[in-house]
């Protein structure tokens, strides 16, 4: 089997407890911004699943939440809207 034969795992929708990790410039309101954007597309987001971690030097903050993913289009829309904030560097 070659690398080109390896397919990424398929996600079955709806997918409960789908993790989204957002990394951005640390600053006031970053986690609130992330939650606000994700809730537009996943209104059932449980904010109690939020996990935040500062980078070693405190320049960046990672925010992870769990959502019920309903479609590829939903995940793409979340990614696009998070990147459009200008404060997000990476969405995993």
From Swiss-Prot:
Family to which this protein belongs: Belongs to the UPF0250 family.
Organism domain of life: Bacteria
PANTHER family in the record: UPF0250 PROTEIN YBED
One Pfam short name: DUF493
Entry's Gene Ontology cellular component terms: cytosol
Entry-linked InterPro entries: UPF0250_YbeD-like, YbeD-like_sf
NCBIfam families in UniProt: PRK00341.1
The protein, known as: UPF0250 protein Pmen_3793
């Amino acid at each position: 089997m070659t690398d080109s034969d390896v397919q990424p795992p398929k996600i079955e929708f709806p997918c409960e407890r789908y993790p989204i990790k957002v990394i951005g410039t640390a600053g006031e309101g970053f986690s609130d911004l992330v939650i606000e954007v994700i809730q537009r597309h996943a209104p059932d987001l449980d904010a109690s699943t939020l996990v935040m971690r500062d980078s070693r030097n405190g320049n960046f903050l990672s925010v992870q939440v769990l959502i019920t993913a309903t479609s590829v289009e939903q995940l793409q829309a979340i990614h696009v809207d998070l990147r459009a904030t200008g404060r997000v560097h990476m969405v995993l």
